UniProtKB/Swiss-Prot annotation:
Alphabetically ordered keywords of this record: Amino-acid biosynthesis, Aromatic amino acid biosynthesis, FAD, Flavoprotein, FMN, Lyase, NADP
InterPro entries: Chorismate_synth, Chorismate_synth_AroC_sf, Chorismate_synthase_CS
Source taxon at top rank: Bacteria
Note describing how the cofactor binds: Reduced FMN (FMNH(2)).
Family: Belongs to the chorismate synthase family.
Protein name stated in the entry: Chorismate synthase
Record has GTP-binding as a keyword: no
Keyword Transmembrane set for record: no
Stored PROSITE patterns: CHORISMATE_SYNTHASE_1, CHORISMATE_SYNTHASE_2, CHORISMATE_SYNTHASE_3
UniProt pathway: Metabolic intermediate biosynthesis; chorismate biosynthesis; chorismate from D-erythrose 4-phosphate and phosphoenolpyruvate: step 7/7
Record-linked HAMAP family: Chorismate_synth
Lineage, opening ranks: Bacteria, Pseudomonadati, Pseudomonadota, Gammaproteobacteria, Alteromonadales
Length: 364
């Protein structure tokens, strides 16, 4: 299997399966001298890990990361950083009854057809369990971005099913299990999820992720545009079926006079483009949104077929998230951080000495 790495200068490679011995990743290209301990990654891993809310999977994994290499006396050495998380709460027997059954909406059928075999235990490599290592690697990138360049990244759930955030209070995001920025909707979210769990069904969500302090100039047109790489990284998250940069699909109904981000010596008047113009960062906040589908691992009976081509009823048992978006916020943050880190290093390699006489614009 190829496709396990992302990045050119800051390269993250992950390995491991949902019910395997462990998950791991290798980070190549991290600059030397960055102070780094397991605690720097553990915070984001705890935000993502299962079993922390009654509305996420009951699988209880501590997700304690270990640094295997690339750090000496508390600082990165510039060599490959090896990270490992052991799997400790697998219940593979939950999947024995579906080992020859394709779960609709999952990668079971496509993995079987592509590779001629598959690890049916929790989805194997296709499981979102793998994203724990992306979060760990993203935490390294986030620390460097903030400490060296003043770039901060944060995400939140902007919609769960029919419930949308109408106000954005950043102080609220970490104060509730939904990473929801609108406190007035928390009771409605709680009630909605209670009824959803009773029905045995699942629901989709929309996650927003923002990076502030990004300098002008990141992005390598034409085929390595910054927004293209961001979309690629975010689309690679399990269950993501749509990505928007800036106003996204909202531009369809905009007129040119409405959607352009007017400029003056005092700064930009708006940010419809989401911080990227012509594939290059404009210095405004990078704004992206992702749409996550409802998981197909539900207890509502459905029709499927076996590996032998026979019709069968499927009822997925096991421990699953009724809304995968609840744990997706730190994953989206991590993927945006990895892309920005990679492009910062690429920009430094080629354009570090470039000086423009045009003043740098901010927001009015």
């Amino acid at each position: 299997m190829s496709g396990n790495s992302i990045g050119q200068n800051f390269v993250v490679t992950t390995f491991g399966e949902s019910h395997g011995v462990a998950l791991g990743c290798i980070i190549d290209g991290c600059p030397p001298g960055l102070e780094l301990t397991e605690a720097d990654m553990q915070h984001d891993l705890d935000r993502r890990r299962p079993g922390t809310s009654r509305y996420t999977t009951a699988r209880r994994e501590p997700d304690e990361v270990r640094i295997l290499s690339g750090v000496f006396e508390g600082k990165t050495t510039g060599t490959s950083i090896g990270l490992l998380i052991e799997n400790t709460d697998q219940r593979s027997q939950d999947y024995s009854n579906i080992k020859d059954l394709f779960r609709p909406g999952h990668a079971d059928y496509t993995y079987q057809q592509k590779y001629g075999m598959r690890d049916y235990r929790g989805g194997g490599r296709s499981s979102a369990r793998e994203t724990a290592m992306r979060v760990a690697a993203g935490a390294v990138a986030k620390k460097y971005l903030k400490q060296v360049h003043g770039i901060e990244i944060y995400g939140f759930m902007s919609q769960l099913g029919p419930i949308c955030a109408e106000t954005i209070d950043l102080d609220q995001i970490e104060q509730n299990a939904f990473f929801f920025p609108d406190a007035s909707k928390l009771e409605a979210l709680d009630e909605y999820m209670r009824e959803l769990k009773k029905s045995g069904d699942s629901i989709g969500a929309k996650i927003s992720v923002i990076a502030t302090g990004v300098p002008v100039g990141l992005g390598e047109p034409v085929f390595d545009r910054l927004d293209a790489d961001i979309a690629h990284a975010l689309m690679g998250i399990n269950a993501v079926k749509g990505v928007e940069i800036g106003d996204g699909f909202g531009v369809v109904t905009q007129k040119g006079s409405e959607g352009r981000d007017l400029m003056s010596p005092q700064g930009f008047e708006s940010n419809h483009a989401g911080g990227v113009l012509g594939g290059i960062s404009s210095g405004q906040p990078i704004i992206a949104h992702i749409a996550l589908k409802p998981t197909s691992s539900i207890s509502v009976p459905g029709q499927s077929m076996t590996a032998q081509g026979e019709m069968a009823e499927v009822v997925t048992k096991g421990r699953h998230d009724p809304c995968v978006g609840i744990r997706a916020v730190p994953i989206a943050e991590a993927m945006l951080a990895i892309v920005l880190m990679d492009h910062l290093l690429r920009h430094r390699a080629q354009n570090q000495d470039v000086r423009s006489h045009t003043p740098v614009l901010g927001m009015r």
